[in-house]
Amino acid sequence: MSNERGRGRGGNRGGRGGMEGGSARRGAWRNGPPPAGSFPHSRGGSPALGQSPTPRMSINDHMHDLKIVQGERKGFQTDTDISRAAGPVERELQPWVPDGPSPPPQSNGGSGNADFETFGTTNNITWDQFETNERLFGAKTDFKEELYTTKLNKSGPDFHKREKEAERLAKQIMGQTSKNAHIAEERGQATDIRDEEEKYSGVSRAPNAYVPPSARRAMGQSSAALRPNPTFESNTNGSTPIPAKPASPAAHETAPPAPERRISDDPVGSKPEAPAMKVTGTTIRPITENAEVTVNGTNVTAETKPELSGVVNEWRQFVGTEREKVEAKKQSVLKSEKEKQLADFKKFQANFKVPLPLPKDILPILSKDEAKQKDIEAKATNALQAAKERKLSIAKDSPAKSPVILNSVKSDAPKPAPPKKIVMKIPEIPPFNPAKRKAPAVPVPESATQDIKLITSPAPSNGSLASQATKLNPTASTFVFKPRADAAPFKPGQPSVSPSIAPHQPSAGPSNTSASTAVPKGNAFFRDKLPEKTHINAREDFNPWKHGPVPRPNTVGTGWPYPGRKVGVPPPFMSPAAPPQMQMQFEDDPTSPSPHPAQPAMMPGMPPNYPPYGRFQPGMPPPYGVPGGMQNPMFSPGPHFSPHPGQPMGQPQHMMPGGPQPNMPMYFQNGMPQNPAFLPPQMQQFPHNPQRPGPGPGPGGPQMFYPNQMPPMPHQTPLQQHPVPFSGPSPAQPQFQHQHQHQHQHPHQQAPPPPPVQMSPAHSTPSGPGGVVQGGPQQNGQTQG
């Protein structure tokens, strides 16, 4: 079965498709197809029908001839070779011609034959596609015109007016002509003799369309051939036709474009006799000689010479060649201009030198050799000097020639008058009260009472204009106003007379000179008396201590000698010689601006301040019920810590301790015990503590009383002290004990010696010389440095 297949594989599976090696392969038959009886069941035969008398040709049989041609050709094939080998594939198109005459077209634009075959006779019936479909096929439409356009409001008051206007516009549009064949048929206009292919699928080129020069040479014509053809009008005597004007623009628009005319390239002598041209409007048709020509509705016999087409052809060729010559000349001119401009640029580049000195930093870039650098610098200097000399020579030559040209030219034409000198008129200062002050009577000369006409100056002549022009100085300085020296003096207590400016009159004699009055000379602003010039010494006159010495600081009191709030500045250190009851007071009384001794006033305890946070000694409730006991944060006082002194207490009262004062150490610090050397300052409070004035604890000094038993403190011996430069605590922060004052004493409450520091809550105790604390009525402790 394998050798009977048409796939080309034989029994021995070694052949290429021949009869000896096996069956032929499909598409690989050599030297034509095999005979009909070779393959009973191959292509073209059927097992059921037996052998086919004429087997089918293979679809690749045309490749046989192509392979033969390819075997003969050698080398690479280009596109031209391939297209040439394929042979011409164009065929001539034949227009379709109906079998019988078609009926005339209908008025509604449809084809008469198709309408007659499909819809029957529909003469004088408006075409309605929806009605026709419903009548023939029963298809009803739901078309609504307002879905695609504006809905007409037929009930409007101006509907009829708008309908008439629409009809007028429709008639105007339908009456217009169009070169489009489709639009012309829709408007019912008469069609021309062009066939359907030319009207609907052809390209109609406008008469004045641009045609490139290469296309003109290929077509054998110039652009002049594409101009609109004129309308020929023949004379009655049969002479040469004369171009005539179109009858009307409407007739020119209605005429379709003329068919393309072919122009022969044969010479004039070898041309056969051409038939005459029949002219009707703008359509030209070939007719015989002495034929009738319809011109403006009149039949005229015209004779056209057969040499006309040859002359026109030669004329068009001449115009085309001349146009090409003009274009070539224009291109050559442009090229020469570009070359000239390029030459100018090259010349400028060769001769131009920068008119600036050569920068020093460019020399290493131009050359690395020092000798060459010096040469380059010398050349640049010489070129710069030459450029400057050239400019100076040009500047000297130009002004020397200009006056010669101006003087040599003489013209009788009037020259424009030069600008007149600007005269500034500054009015005098009017009097302060013009109603009370009147101008004194001025003697008026007799000539002023007469009616004298003003004498106008004559028109300036060319000589006067030239003289005025020579007086103008272009290098004059800027105008600066200066007061008149002959102005009348101004006195505030006397009326001032504003001088009147009289018109310029020619001098008539000594009478005019006698009428003028002498005006005293003086300063225009200060008049008679000028102010004396004084010398100002800025260092001496503007010295605030010129009339008094600078007061020493110790002589200035602490009071505020100005009205308003009285302010006193406390000294940073208390004087050791001050009396025990010396205290600083701030009073609004102007009689006591400075501190003075006063008796301790009886007053209740100091009200506690309410800072945000504070801590008290354990076992004592806070004086004001703040939850958590948060009063003051833990902080250490600065080196300049010196609170203001307080006032003594009055009648002893049982009160809770006051809150912590600003800038005071904390009362108590919670937590683990710390190193004494780094222990921050702390304060202790006692609700009732007797006040015992006197000196601080020392050798044999009195001891302080405490409300409860204190642990023994073996620090009673005098220690070596150092002077404290500031009133703040020492680096080794001691512990402070804070106690309120009480007037009466409790002898049974005696305790061991007090700690090193005890302080009243109202003030801090300043230290005296040697660091010893000075006692006072408000002091109940000492500070040990």
From Swiss-Prot:
Pfam families given in the database record: LsmAD
Polar residues: bias regions: 231-240, 508-517
Composition-biased stretches (Gly residues): 9-21
Changes after translation: Phosphorylated. Probably dephosphorylated by calcineurin.
Subcellular location: Cytoplasm, P-body; Cytoplasm, Stress granule
Compositional bias per record (Pro residues), positions renumbered to this chain: 690-700
Consequences of knocking out this gene: Abnormal sexual reproduction; decreases MFalpha1 expression and abolishes basidiospore chain formation. Decreases virulence in a mouse intranasal inhalation model for pulmonary infection; virulence is completely lost in a double knockout with CRZ1. Resistance to high temperature; resistance is suppressed in a double knockout with CRZ1. Resistance to tacrolimus (calcineurin inhibitor). Resistance to dithiothreitol (ER stress inducer). Resistance to tunicamycin (ER stress inducer).
Protein family (similarity comment): Belongs to the ataxin-2 family.
Name the UniProt record assigns to this protein: PAB1-binding protein 1
Gene this protein is translated from: PBP1
